[in-house]
Each structure stands twice: as structure tokens, then as C-alpha cells.
Regions:
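Short beta-to-alpha linker loops that shape the active-site pocket of alpha/beta-hydrolase fold enzymes
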Residues: 36, 69-73, 136, 227
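Glycine-rich nucleophile elbow surrounding the catalytic serine of serine-hydrolase chemistry
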Residues: 109-119
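Glycine-rich "HGGG/HGxG" loop immediately N-terminal to the catalytic nucleophile
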Residues: 68-82
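Short, surface-exposed "cap/lid" segments of acyl-processing enzymes
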Residues: 20-60
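Alpha/beta-hydrolase active-site loop
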Residues: 49, 79-99
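N-terminal cap/lid segment of alpha/beta-hydrolase-fold proteins
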Residues: 1-24
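Alpha/beta-hydrolase fold nucleophile elbow
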Residues: 100-111
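The alpha/beta-hydrolase serine catalytic core
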Residues: 12, 106, 124-210, 214-223, ...
Length: 251
């Protein structure tokens, strides 16, 4: 079903996928975080396949899956900021925790959404495990030329208001404040799987290796041979994600 998640003053569009025949007792929930949109006006369309992925995961695992749109994307309100997106992950986790019969919450994310999943899990022990697909280890490339990246944000449509951000320097400083590489060390011993395509042209596979190293060998690193950046479209990555879900010991 379609729903809305409150993140501060903003409403985020969400797709809540649940088993058609719910088993008795608590049911695990997965919060699914999309990545940064690609291409002109990509903010409107780039996350459109996530509801289908959520439905597929539910059909195969029996979990509840919450797939939401970050602020500035799809039908969600607001404009992109990195700390704002981190707030959105927390709001989605709050929503999942408060759903009736939730039996624990896990988070999975693609690209920037995966990096933010790591950062939220480092601060939120309600999150019982994290799976990432093509997550970057840091956001320094966005910080390197903040005004050029701001122009890119307007092009893809994640910043819709001409008056936003009110302070470009403060907006850009958030890219240095959000540090997935530091956050990942706080997640073990909770389950952590890092999936990455060996031929990812957007986020190099070295980022996944750096994250795994920072987790002190306690992450399950899966490098998928020949795969690119959009792992949600790779059946091997989706199968690995479902296998990870099934190993969480909740069935």
C-alpha cells in the first residue's frame, strides 16, 4: 500500500509492502533506502522501481518492507540536504518500529542510501542489521565543488526551491559531517553485508573494501563480478540480499 512518513515538518511518500497472508506473531521489517537520482529531472523517476523490489522481497521472504522517497524525490516534500536525508532514514525507521507487530527492524540501501543506512545504524541500536548495495565510503566528491554539485542537484530536481539552501556553505559542510567510513565500525557485531559490483563506474569497488576494512573484518563483503552500479537490477545482488534477510534468524 502507499503511505506517508512524517520527517520533521515534511511528508515523505512511501510504499509499505506486507505479506498477503501474514503469519501469526511479530514480523521483521526492512527499511529500503534508494540512492541519489541520476540524469535531468531524475528526482521524479529514479526511485520508481523500488516499490517493485519491495514487493518482490516481501513475496520471497515474508518480511514487511518500507520503501520511501527521500525529501526532494518522487512525491516527497522538501529539498535535498545530506543531514536531511539522514533524518529521513531515522523517520522511516521510526515508522517501521511503530508498525503493529514489527519484530525488529533492518535497513538496506543503495549507493548514497546505503551510506546513510550505515550512518543511522551507528547511532541507532534499534537497527538490527544493515545491507548496502554500492555504498560510497565518503561524500568528499560532493564537497569538492559544492556550487557545481548544487547546480547538479537543481538539474536532477532534488532541489526544487530557488531560495534553497539559504546558506550554501552550511549545506555543503554536511558532506564532511556525514562519514560512513567512521560509522561502519559501530555496527558489528550486528549483521552487516556490503555488496558491490566489480565494474561499478560510479562508486569504485575500493570504497566497499575500505568499508569492510573499517568494520575490522566483521562485515560480509560481496563483490559481484562484472556488475555495475545499479545492483537492484542485478539478480545476483537481489538474491544475495534475500539470502542475507533469511539468515537473520527471525523465521
Amino acid at each position: 500500500m502507499d503511505g506517508a512518513i512524517q520527517s520533521g515538518d515534511l511528508k515523505l511518500a512511501a510504499h509499505i509492502a506486507q505479506p498477503s497472508r501474514a503469519a501469526a506473531g511479530p514480523r521483521p521489517a526492512l527499511v529500503l533506502c534508494h540512492g541519489f537520482p541520476a540524469g535531468p529531472r531524475g528526482a521524479l523517476t529514479s526511485a520508481q522501481t523500488y516499490p517493485d523490489l519491495a514487493d518482490h522481497l516481501v513475496a520471497e521472504t515474508g518480511w514487511t518492507v518500507v520503501a520511501f522517497n527521500f525529501r526532494g524525490t518522487g512525491e516527497s516534500e522538501g529539498n535535498f540536504s545530506l543531514l536531511g536525508w539522514l533524518d529521513d532514514v531515522r523517520a522511516a525507521v521510526d515508522y517501521a518500529v511503530d508498525m503493529p507487530r514489527t519484530g525488529g527492524v533492518w535497513v538496506a540501501g543503495s549507493s548514497a542510501g546505503g551510506a546513510l543506512a550505515l550512518c543511522e545504524a551507528a547511532e541507532d541500536d534499534r537497527i538490527l542489521g544493515v545491507a548496502t548495495l554500492a555504498a560510497p565510503a565518503e561524500f568528499d566528491n560532493w564537497a569538492s565543488d559544492a556550487r557545481a554539485f548544487l547546480a547538479h542537484c537543481r538539474l536532477v530536481g532534488v532541489i526544487r526551491d530557488s531560495s534553497f539552501p539559504p546558506d550554501v556553505e552550511a549545506w555543503a559542510a554536511e558532506f564532511k559531517k556525514v562519514q560512513p567510513l567512521a560509522a561502519v565500525a559501530e555496527i558489528p557485531p550486528r549483521p552487516l553485508v556490503l555488496m558491490h559490483g566489480s565494474d561499478d563506474p560510479t562508486v569504485p569497488v575500493s570504497d566497499a573494501r575500505a568499508l569492510a576494512d573499517a568494520a575490522d573484518g566483521q562485515a560480509d563483503l560481496r563483490v559481484i563480478a562484472g556488475a555495475g552500479h545499479r545492483l537492484r537490477h542485478d539478480p545476483r545482488a537481489v538474491a544475495a540480499l534475500m539470502g542475507w534477510m533469511e539468515r537473520q534468524g527471525v523465521h
